[in-house]
Amino acid sequence: ADDAAALKTTLTRLADQRQLDLILTTGGTGFGPRDVTPEATMAVATRLAPGIAEAIRAASLAITPRAMLSRAVSVIRGKTLIVNLPGSPKAVCESMDVFLPQMPHALGLLRGEVRDCAR
């Protein structure tokens, strides 16, 4: 997603009108001039969820030092979690292995269905 305005519009529509629990973006998170996914994602956020992007980056650093070049973010808009993923299919799979196990709990919290956070 290289057009920040279009991406902001799409993310807003999906979160607000479609009321999705989870939106995943792929690509546009590097240092290139057209990599604007993190900025567009931050622009629609109502709250930050930095731990997800941090966990993905930490796991990715064990695989390649270039993971430090990721600018991916994770945010909340209303009751929707938005997570930026890398553009590489291999890196997407590796990233999903990191955060998917926590998604039922995270999404349950956003929906107000989970009360016990201590476990």
State the predicted function of each range:
Residues 1-119:
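Non-catalytic beta/alpha edge segments that cap or flank active sites
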